[in-house]
A protein has these predicted regions:
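Class I S-adenosyl-L-methionine
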Residues: 1-6, 11-115, 178, 200-204, ...
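Conserved beta-strand scaffold positions in the cores of enzyme catalytic domains, especially
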Residues: 49-51, 116, 145, 190-192
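Class I SAM-dependent methyltransferase SAM-binding "motif I" and its flanking Rossmann-like core
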Residues: 92, 96-161, 211, 225-228
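Residue-level detector of structured alpha->beta connecting loops
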Residues: 21, 84, 133, 162-163
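A polyampholytic, Gly/Pro-enriched intrinsically disordered region
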Residues: 68-78, 134-147, 209-219
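A contiguous loop/helix-start segment that scaffolds small-molecule binding in enzyme catalytic cores
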Residues: 81, 158-234
């Protein structure tokens, strides 16, 4: 579904939504409309959409998380037995820190023989780079993508290197991220963004981070250390 802007859903993605009998959208609560659903409704009627509760933010209790996943997988399996084609909408790309990968494994076990296809999507880091003007990579520069939920140490190790570092899901650890950027001398060129393409969009220099919590899905780009001139690393 892309990062949230309905105009960034690919043509192939739109076709998949329209060709499906039902479209499953992941939510934390059946009464809450998530970002994936809000995007989907630009392309299919509401009666075609089915909300399924996933443990999207459950990190404290593995047993409860696995039970929630089993329940969600069971619900999607029911839909697959009742319909020829079921689409699952996920923001970003289905193979990048996505709910979809876990669901696909569950469905493969519950409904053997199900043909599972994925449609690539535009990621938040691509959208933030385009909107902020931050260049993700040049020449031989490496690119490291880190979920801040993995811990501040992992982020600091990435920032200590020469390449571009992208941090996902850093909103709740904004203070720790700002400290890591300052300690590694990477804060001046870094930029963060949230709700990209939506009315509440925010794109700011990382130097403005003041320790206040940000939206969970906030994304940060710390560009590579670039000393040479144009084309110097080709």
């Amino acid at each position: 579904m892309g990062p949230g802007d309905p105009e960034l859903v690919t043509v192939k993605g739109v076709n998949a939504l329209r060709e499906a009998d039902v479209v499953v959208v992941p939510v934390m609560d059946t009464m809450e409309r998530g970002r994936a659903e809000a995007t989907v409704l630009h392309y299919v009627p509401e009666e075609k959409v089915v909300r399924v509760v996933f443990a999207l933010n459950e990190r404290s209790d593995r047993g409860r998380r696995e039970a929630a996943w089993d329940a969600a997988g069971g619900r999607v399996a029911e839909l697959l037995r009742a319909h020829d084609a079921v689409a699952f909408a996920t923001i970003g790309d289905p193979n990048v820190y996505s709910t979809f990968t876990y669901l696909a494994q569950t469905i493969d076990a519950l409904v053997p023989g199900t043909v599972i296809e994925t449609v690539p999507g535009i990621t938040a880091m691509q959208d933030l780079a385009a909107r902020s003007g931050a260049v993700l990579t040049e020449g031989t520069e490496p690119l490291t993508l880190v979920p801040v939920t993995a811990g501040a140490t992992v982020l600091k190790e990435a920032l200590a290197g020469p390449g571009t570092v992208v941090a996902y899901k850093f909103g709740r650890q904004a203070h720790e991220v700002a400290e890591a950027l300052r300690e590694t001398g990477r804060i001046e060129d870094a930029v963060w963004g949230s709700a990209l393409g939506l009315t509440e969009e925010s794109i700011r220099p990382a130097a403005d981070l003041d320790g206040a919590p940000l939206p969970y899905l906030s994304t940060l780009i710390a560009p590579a250390r670039r000393d040479g001139g144009r084309g110097g690393k080709l």
